[in-house]
């Protein structure tokens, strides 16, 4: 099947989806309606571009006909030639765009994510920066219309974050935030620095797709579940009922502790969401490490300790080291305006994949 046949098949399916989504039987089946809605949304950009491309092809045909029919009318012929030139340039642009839109999609792109942020090298300052990153992602999620839920958090005594685990839910969350995994470095003068010297600290970010139970089954025999009394806030319930849950995946020794909720069942459900994502991610990383050539052709899928981005406060500068992107917009980026960074990373990744296909 050539590219044009692929595009026509996508458009045909899109039109079929439109009819299905108007069918009362489908509308009454919530799960099917949601699945078909997601499928329609995932192909909308491709179909829109393909329809515009067909208009451009028609413009080329019309311009060529106009040149033939000019009958010595120099002005008309000149105008038609310019229209033909413009249309051919548009055709090339759309062909490149459509090739990218037809690239195989990451099966996780439409999923919600588990987001983990930790203060790393730099003590209190690293943990304060981890708090800044948490706020940045919260504000970005709000701008995208996503739901942001902090599931577990450990704070230090100066307003920083030792570790935070959050669930981010909404449309195409993973597709936009999957490139955030790695080490984020900050260069700034800490509030505790009396000499005005710039310090360098690091926080780490891990983004994992949410894995449903039906997608990844963990053998209950591989889990150890401990129930204990929660500590900290929670009122009288803390002392009377053991509601905190610790789950250990024995083969990998991956642990999750959850005590934010007031009931044992809710803590257990949240802990299982996190451990399922972590275990699936653990084995996915092993599989990916065995595909070195493929990993090197993409971004954001290498060493989790790799420094991916630097935030330089004195110069109001953010640099993404993977793609050489530098923006003098640190203040707006930390305020949650991440679109320019995310769009650049997505475009780079798509371009790299396209080059791989063309080899």
Swiss-Prot record:
Residues 288-307 are annotated as: Disordered. GO terms for cellular component: cytoplasm. It is found in: Cytoplasm. PROSITE patterns: RF_PROK_I. InterPro entries: PCRF, Pep_chain_release_fac_I, Pep_chain_release_fac_I_sf, Prokaryotic/Mito_RF, RF-1. Keywords: Cytoplasm, Methylation, Protein biosynthesis. The modification N5-methylglutamine is found at residue 236. Residues 293-307 have a biased composition (Basic and acidic residues). The keyword Nucleotidyltransferase does not apply. NCBIfam families: prfA, PRK00591.1. Peptide chain release factor 1 directs the termination of translation in response to the peptide chain termination codons UAG and UAA. This is Peptide chain release factor 1. It comes from Streptococcus sanguinis (strain SK36).
């Amino acid at each position: 099947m050539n590219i044009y046949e692929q595009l026509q098949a996508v458009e045909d399916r899109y039109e079929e989806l439109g009819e299905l989504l108007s069918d009362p039987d489908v509308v009454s089946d919530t799960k099917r309606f949601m699945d078909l809605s997601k499928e329609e949304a995932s192909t909308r950009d491709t179909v829109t571009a393909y329809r515009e491309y067909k208009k451009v092809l028609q413009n080329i045909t019309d311009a060529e006909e106009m040149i033939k029919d000019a009958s010595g009318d120099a002005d008309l012929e000149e105008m038609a030639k310019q229209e033909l030139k413009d249309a051919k340039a548009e055709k090339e642009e759309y062909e490149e765009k459509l090739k990218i839109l037809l690239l195989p999609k990451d099966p996780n792109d439409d999923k919600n994510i588990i987001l983990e942020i930790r203060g790393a090298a730099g003590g209190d300052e690293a943990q304060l920066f981890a708090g800044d990153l948490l706020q940045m992602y919260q504000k970005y999620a709000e701008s995208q219309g996503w739901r942001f839920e902090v599931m577990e958090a450990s704070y230090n005594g100066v307003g920083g974050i030792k570790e935070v685990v959050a669930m981010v839910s909404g449309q195409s969350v993973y597709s936009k935030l999957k490139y955030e995994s790695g080490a984020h470095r900050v260069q700034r003068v800490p509030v505790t620095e009396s000499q005005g010297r710039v310090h360098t600290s690091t926080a780490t970010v891990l983004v994992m797709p949410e894995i449903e139970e039906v997608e990844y089954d963990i053998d209950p025999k591989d889990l150890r579940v401990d129930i204990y009394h929660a500590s900290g806030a929670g009122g009288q319930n803390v002392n009377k009922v053991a509601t905190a849950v610790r789950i250990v995946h024995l083969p990998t020794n991956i642990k999750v502790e959850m005590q934010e909720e007031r009931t044992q069942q809710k803590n257990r459900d949240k802990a299982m969401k996190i451990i399922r994502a972590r275990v699936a991610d653990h084995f996915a990383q092993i599989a990916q490490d065995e595909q070195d050539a493929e990993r090197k052709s993409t971004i954001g899928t290498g060493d989790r300790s790799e420094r991916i981005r630097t935030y330089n406060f004195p110069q109001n500068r953010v640099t993404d080291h993977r793609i050489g992107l530098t923006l003098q917009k640190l203040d707006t980026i930390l305020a949650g305006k991440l679109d320019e960074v995310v769009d650049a990373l997505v475009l780079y990744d798509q371009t790299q994949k396209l080059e791989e296909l063309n080899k």
